């Protein structure tokens, strides 16, 4: 996925799923399944239920995304 094609949205983590997947509710009300980006996984960034996150999505599949940032 090219960086300029990505859509970045803000959301809140609703649920933790197996294999470092998360259910995230976006600000517009949609619920998507998201996984952690490689740099967050490498640096052991912990994501818990209720965290505010930035999700990067592709325009081709708006039901899946990648968590690229966790707000403090």
From Swiss-Prot:
GO molecular function: ribosome binding; rRNA binding; translation initiation factor activity
Domain S1-like: 1-72
GO CC terms of this entry: cytosol
Keywords: Cytoplasm, Initiation factor, Protein biosynthesis, RNA-binding, rRNA-binding
Location in the cell: Cytoplasm
Recorded coiled-coil stretches: none
Keyword rRNA-binding in annotation: yes
Role this protein plays: One of the essential components for the initiation of protein synthesis. Stabilizes the binding of IF-2 and IF-3 on the 30S subunit to which N-formylmethionyl-tRNA(fMet) subsequently binds. Helps modulate mRNA selection, yielding the 30S pre-initiation complex (PIC). Upon addition of the 50S ribosomal subunit IF-1, IF-2 and IF-3 are released leaving the mature 70S translation initiation complex.
Subunit relationships: Component of the 30S ribosomal translation pre-initiation complex which assembles on the 30S ribosome in the order IF-2 and IF-3, IF-1 and N-formylmethionyl-tRNA(fMet); mRNA recruitment can occur at any time during PIC assembly.
Family, similarity comment: Belongs to the IF-1 family.
Protein name: Translation initiation factor IF-1
Gene name of this polypeptide: infA
């Amino acid at each position: 996925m090219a960086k300029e094609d990505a859509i970045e949205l803000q959301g809140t983590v609703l649920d933790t799923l197996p294999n470092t997947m998360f259910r995230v509710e976006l600000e517009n009300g949609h619920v998507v399944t998201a996984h952690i980006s490689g740099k967050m996984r490498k640096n052991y960034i912990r994501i818990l239920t209720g965290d505010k996150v930035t999700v990067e999505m592709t325009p081709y599949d708006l039901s899946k995304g990648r968590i690229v940032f966790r707000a403090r």
